């Protein structure tokens, strides 16, 4: 391997063998080992000479391209129409290998490697070109740091003094967004436990009837007698009595619908008259949407009494207090937090808090009936009152189905205290819903981002032309060097050093012998190609 500098010249007609490229098709190795070694030495010498000639030709071609480019630039007056958007100069980012030179120069870039045959391809009888391109290998992409789309770079801020106002607007926008986010969170927390006010729900129970006096014996086509039971209600506005139940005005849309106040409604009919289906049950959990009222229609011409059972739907859940706890607090049905708060106010009003340990309070006679202890810790109140709380009893109503007289037949109306959320709750819900639909803001942001991208593009173009105007020669040299580096990266030759490969010391390294053996072992044992051919 030490006699590479004294290799004899190979005849011109012989074809060179590829060296160190596993992607090339190779000829078969003859059975004579001595012939194989001599053949390898001859081909290796030819390959080395070819690599040296190729490197020299490439260097000469590159210098020729550079000289021709400078001459044409001078002839065209240094115009850069085609290269105005090129990055890669003056810290403008990585350059593109497809950049055209100024003045629309129709000049092809010199390829660094000649074409080559893929493995297994048949050998060609034509004269092989001394220039061959290597297989393209994808280069690893560098992650480009993505700048915020709405922010301006410091380079742009230095060029445009007016950008300081835009930066101030961005800071103000961030403060507004932070404030809106905090308010949105506060509204969401408030909606979880909405404040309510007590109002009176007036429930109307009445029935109407039809075809009760038109029954003609022996006429099967006559309409049968029917009756209809209706249960409706509405929230009283400041105690004002609404109109007659048969002509109840439309409910206030700000208030919940009638069925939302009930968990379950059960109507029991006379089992003697309606043995098949005497029980009608409506459940809020199975109802797809709240209703303004309930209506039951049946056939019949006999009057009877219907039983109505209404189970209230309290949100949050309410409990009925025991007699002992009711005597202490003076309330009958209430939520657990309000019951605990009422006990706390009772203790504070009577100064029952233990002065030595404020976490305890002393029980008077009324509290001793409830808790059964003389002293109790505040944290134990919630646990102690559990057996004094029970589900509130349902509302039982009875209505007589009348089939004569006034139609509809009004029986009675009933007032029930219910919790109605503040009307502002609906406005808060609408506010949260509208806050998510910011299409106009998104459109403005998109327009701002497009303007920012255009500003950055113009800054790159300005830097490109400014660098060319200040030093045209150095600028063009840097441009050519950048494009050459990009071409090497695309061709997968970024790690090669052509200058080192020109010297014989490069092939005297320890790895060369192992590379030659690996190359020979990779060649097929037999083939159609003869020695010295592709």
From Swiss-Prot:
Tell me which SUPFAM superfamilies the record gives. Answer: SWIB/MDM2 domain (SSF47592)
Keyword terms of this UniProt record: Chromatin regulator, Nucleus, Transcription, Transcription regulation
In this UniProt entry, which cysteines form S-S bonds? none
Give the compositionally biased regions (Low complexity): 94-105
One cellular component GO annotation, for this chain's record? Answer: nucleus
Region of interest: Disordered: 1-33, 78-132
Ranges where the SWIB/MDM2 domain occurs = 314-391
* Magnesium keyword on record: no
Q: How does it assemble?
A: Part of a SWI-SNF complex.
Q: Which family does it belong to?
A: Belongs to the SMARCD family.
Known role: Involved in transcriptional activation and repression of select genes by chromatin remodeling (alteration of DNA-nucleosome topology).
The protein's name in its UniProt record: SWI/SNF complex component SNF12 homolog
UniProt lineage? Eukaryota, Viridiplantae, Streptophyta, Embryophyta, Tracheophyta
């Amino acid at each position: 391997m030490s006699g590479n500098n004294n290799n004899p010249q190979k005849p011109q007609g012989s074809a060179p063998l590829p060296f160190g490229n596993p992607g090339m098709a190779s000829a078969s190795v003859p059975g004579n080992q001595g012939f194989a070694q001599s053949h390898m030495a001859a081909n290796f010498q030819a390959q080395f000479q070819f690599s040296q000639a190729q490197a020299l030709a490439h260097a000469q071609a590159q210098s020729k391209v550079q000289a021709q480019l400078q001459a044409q630039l001078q002839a065209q007056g240094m115009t850069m129409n085609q290269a105005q958007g090129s990055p890669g100069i003056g810290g403008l980012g990585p350059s593109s290998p497809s950049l055209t030179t100024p003045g629309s120069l129709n000049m092809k870039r010199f390829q660094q490697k000649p074409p080559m045959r893929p493995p297994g391809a048949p050998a060609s009888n034509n004269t092989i070109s001394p220039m061959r391109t290597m297989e393209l290998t994808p280069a690893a992409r560098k992650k480009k740091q993505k700048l915020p789309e709405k922010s301006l770079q410091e380079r742009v801020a230095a060029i445009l003094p007016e950008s300081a106002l835009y930066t101030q607007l961005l800071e103000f926008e961030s403060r507004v967004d932070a404030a809106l986010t905090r308010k949105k969170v506060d509204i969401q927390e408030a909606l979880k436990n909405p404040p309510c006010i007590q109002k009176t729900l007036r429930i109307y129970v009445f029935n109407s009837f039809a075809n009760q006096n038109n029954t003609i014996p022996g006429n099967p086509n006559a309409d049968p007698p029917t009756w209809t039971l209706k249960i409706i209600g509405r929230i009283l506005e400041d105690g004002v009595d609404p109109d007659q139940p048969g002509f109840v005005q439309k409910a206030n849309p700000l208030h919940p619908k009638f069925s939302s106040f009930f968990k379950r409604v059960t109507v029991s009919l006379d089992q003697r008259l309606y043995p098949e289906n005497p029980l009608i049950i409506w459940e809020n959990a199975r109802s797809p949407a709240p209703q303004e009222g309930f209506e039951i229609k049946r056939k019949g011409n006999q009057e009877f009494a219907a039983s109505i059972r209404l189970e209230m739907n309290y949100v949050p859940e309410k409990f009925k207090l025991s007699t002992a706890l009711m005597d202490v607090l003076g309330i009958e049905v209430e939520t657990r937090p309000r019951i605990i708060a009422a006990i706390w106010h009772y203790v504070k009003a009577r100064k029952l808090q233990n002065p030595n340990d404020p976490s305890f309070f002393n029980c008077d006679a009324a509290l001793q009936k409830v808790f059964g202890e003389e002293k109790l810790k505040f944290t134990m109140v919630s646990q102690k009152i559990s057996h004094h709380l029970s589900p509130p009893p349902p509302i039982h109503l009875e209505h007589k189905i009348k089939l004569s007289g006034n139609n509809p037949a009004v029986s009675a109306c009933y007032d029930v205290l219910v919790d109605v959320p503040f009307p502002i709750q609906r406005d808060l819900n609408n506010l949260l819903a509208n806050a998510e639909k910011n299409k106009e803001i998104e459109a403005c942001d998109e327009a701002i981002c497009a303007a920012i991208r255009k500003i950055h593009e113009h800054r790159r173009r300005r830097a490109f032309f400014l660098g060319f105007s200040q030093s045209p020669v150095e600028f063009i040299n840097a441009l050519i060097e950048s494009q050459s580096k990009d071409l090497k990266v695309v061709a997968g030759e970024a790690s090669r050093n052509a200058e080192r490969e020109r010297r014989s010391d490069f092939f005297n390294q320890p790895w060369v012998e192992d590379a030659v053996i690996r190359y020979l072992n990779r060649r097929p044992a037999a083939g159609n190609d003869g020695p010295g051919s592709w």
